[in-house]
């Protein structure tokens, strides 16, 4: 599949063809914030949608989530909070995700048709943000991958504190980092 499968399924569901597409939004992941759209990706997208579509690239994974949320808003002003397992690289001494500052919790302000990053949390190397912590809980209860966090979210309403009790799911380590028990 890749994006081609999603694109064609979406066009089929809407009953449109590629020539009806004016703008394509592309979002980076696991790349440095501020990176340029890779030319191979631009070429691949243009092959599917044609030359008429304008390509808009968002190198920040979290900014991409924020724009998707804003697209659903009817409000003039909003605080958009993105809580994710991990997004794009903010800063990396080694050039990869290992030991890098990575987007995990980002706050954006939407005002006057402008999206502005206000702050970030949990982005230092080794820190565990809310999304990553949730994925660790997902693994702790027996799911095989952090990709199963959505299944875990679906089970949340069925939880019963009297059955679960006070199981210590996490604690703070000597270095001040959260970790699973």
Where are these regions (language model features)?
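Short acidic/glycine-rich loops and adjacent helix/strand connectors
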Residues: 1-181
């Amino acid at each position: 599949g890749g994006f081609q499968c999603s694109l064609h399924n979406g066009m089929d569901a809407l009953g449109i063809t590629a020539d009806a597409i004016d703008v394509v939004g592309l979002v980076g992941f696991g790349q440095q914030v501020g990176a340029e759209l890779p030319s191979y990706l631009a070429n691949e997208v243009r092959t599917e949608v044609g030359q008429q579509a304008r390509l808009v690239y968002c190198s920040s994974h979290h900014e991409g989530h924020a724009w998707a949320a804003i697209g659903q808003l009817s409000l003039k002003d909003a605080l958009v909070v993105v809580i994710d397992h991990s997004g794009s690289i903010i800063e990396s001494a080694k050039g990869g995700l290992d030991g890098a500052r990575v987007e995990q919790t980002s706050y954006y302000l939407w005002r006057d048709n402008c999206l502005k990053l206000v702050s970030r949390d949990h982005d230092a190397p080794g820190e565990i943000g809310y999304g990553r912590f949730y994925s660790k809980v997902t693994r702790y209860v027996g799911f095989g991958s952090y990709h199963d966090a959505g299944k875990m979210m679906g089970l949340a309403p069925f939880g019963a504190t009297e059955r679960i009790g006070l199981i210590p799911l996490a604690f703070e380590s000597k270095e001040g980092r959260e970790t699973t028990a």
